């Protein structure tokens, strides 16, 4: 693999993916919030790739935070060769922020992307007009042995997004599709880690919160992908896929079609003094007693919404337990409901537990919001109403709602 001369200070960190394709990305473990909203305790990777053919090709750039490492990686792989082409699949700044730095260092480089992408580059202040080569759906470019085909992927998850497919090797440069939160730590391939155990939750949380709204567009891309002989997937975040690709594609089909991965219950509660939490705990215990132990219970005030959204996509049933607050839905619960709406969560069974010491309105408000603002939500007719704290008087309604939820699990969600 290419290296700098002995004595140089460059500290490149690259991985060879195939005989002429290199990963030149970098990890960021300092960033607390992805898009300044989603916690990423395990960090994130910004992936970019260099192809060494008769012509050299860089696929995307990297976030400003890792620009120095990224540039050193690119130069190390080029090993003195010019950079002939930069293909921009996605203009979001976490992948395009270093674009101008690349062009300053390589005045010879031509930039290949689509019309909408070039519009966005100009909006972000990049000077690309004198180097732009516009491509559209179905166009191809030959760089020597390798031919790259360009496939539009609008709203996955920005309007200009596209993916690039190396028809020679079956490598899909998939932009933000098939991405994952989490720094790579040297392990570039998904088969170098226990992905299902250690990475799948972050892959789901990434998809559902970043791309989740655009399921129909993702399904369109998956249909296009199914016509390709994909042997490797190189996303802009997270591990590269070279094995078990159908398994990961199947996860995407579930998420993009808003179909649950498994029968289970996401139980989210909003409680000020512990009384609504107690009722939620009783509900969970009775559910488990009757054989449904796949229950995942969260305090909406403590757990970040991104984790709740991830589980809302994963499980078939959602139970919302909330106290009334200023004659309204508890603000943190309202935030969760709003995120579910924005991210298009649909086709779920929902149970409601409401609490209020006076004027208990939250159950009706949540019911109406789910019914009016969201798609395909089946709200269980049996609900539980508590006035301040649970009493024996609520045992019957609690049991009825448990039974209603279990009965609904036997039904086939259409």
Language-model features, listed with the residues they occupy:
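Short acidic active-site motifs
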Residues: 98, 303-308
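Active-site-proximal loop/helix segment associated with metal-binding centers of metalloenzymes
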Residues: 157-161, 169, 177-212, 256-260
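Short, Lys/Arg-enriched N-terminal segments with co-localized hydrophobic residues
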Residues: 1-10
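Active-site metal-binding motif and surrounding structural segment of the metallo-beta-lactamase
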Residues: 54, 65-112
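Metallo-beta-lactamase
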Residues: 15-19, 112-161, 214-220
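Active-site neighborhood of phospho(di)ester-bond hydrolases with catalytic His/Asp-centered motifs
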Residues: 59-61, 83-91, 111-114, 172-176, ...
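Conserved beta-strand hairpin/beta-sheet module of binuclear metal-dependent hydrolase folds
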Residues: 14-75, 163-166, 170-174, 276
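FMN-binding flavodoxin-like domain, especially the glycine-rich phosphate-binding loop
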Residues: 184, 195-233, 237-240, 282-298, ...
